[in-house]
Amino acid sequence: MKSAFHLDAGRKFFGVPALKTIIDTLAEADIDFFQLYLTDNQGFRFALNDMTMTTPYGTYDLSEVPGDGYCEGPKGPCGSNKFHTQADMDEILAYGKEKGVNIIPCINIPGHMGCLLEKFPHLRYRNSKSSVNMMDPEGMAFALGLLEKFADYFASRGCTHMSFGADEFANDIHPGYPDLIEMGYERIYHDGDMKYFVELFNASAKIICDRNMIPLAFHDGVYYRNDKKYGEMDTRVWLCYWSNGWDTYVTATADYLAEQGFPMINSAGRIYCGMGVKNWQERADRVAAFDPYIFEKDVRVENPEGAMMCFWSDCAFLDGQDDGVTAAGNVGVVLRSFAETMKKY
């Protein structure tokens, strides 16, 4: 069974030395994949040499986007305003290849795009700072154009997998946010606009597959409420399953998605670590008891593709502007526990 580690390097800037430390730890622990999450509301941490993007609706200059984004209540950027250049990313990808760690880049659409949309506010979904308006043809083209631009680069560097995120669309639409009271997928499921997400999901999968990479995404909007009425969705996408939701966010169950033919990655929220997770450094015992066949709400999935331990940087400022060095050093204990657990399967 495949093992993976997800790092939120979008909210928090992790410099090349910190990322190499993590890659070393992953290589020593025999963890197969390193999902490198590069974009969120609090930060956009990677700039290509050419940051212009053209769609049928115009040409966009993205050069001022990379760096810190904005605060959302207790969730804030690290304050460094730093990002990786293309030369940095070339070095990171080459180091991963040298160490035998397969890096999965993640550019998140259609949600968690807040840092980017600060520069293009006319493309926002209604009442949301964080998410693009998929229902607007320009917004749809913008999101897919962004993914295509970065997919071209990562494919050219030999990446075999790429994630387009797809979690928590418009989770900020309720005035009570950052409390997750009303969520975008719940709204568009009921108002008929979920069809636009199905279109985006399938187009994203095609973009990545057409470049000979395997697509990944979080499961949030996929057959929401165990319902296929909005259309078939591309089962080539590996689904990273993190939560069965709550009263106002009723995601599909893991066994239902597996039955539809999706390769399932157990990204269980119960073993999340990171900045803002209380005493996360002490989670080695919890990780040691993790069963990758048991998804959220004790749902068992036979033959999952693998499991992923996630490190999120919701409170990216907690370690100061240290370029991720502290977290890179501290995460080793939990990562090694995860690796030993996965070797049993």
Label the predicted regions.
Residues A27-E28, K97, A155, C209:
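Non-catalytic positions within long, well-ordered alpha-helices that form the structural scaffold/packing
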Residues N41-K97, H112-M140, A170-G192:
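Aromatic- and acidic-residue-enriched carbohydrate-binding clefts of CAZyme catalytic domains
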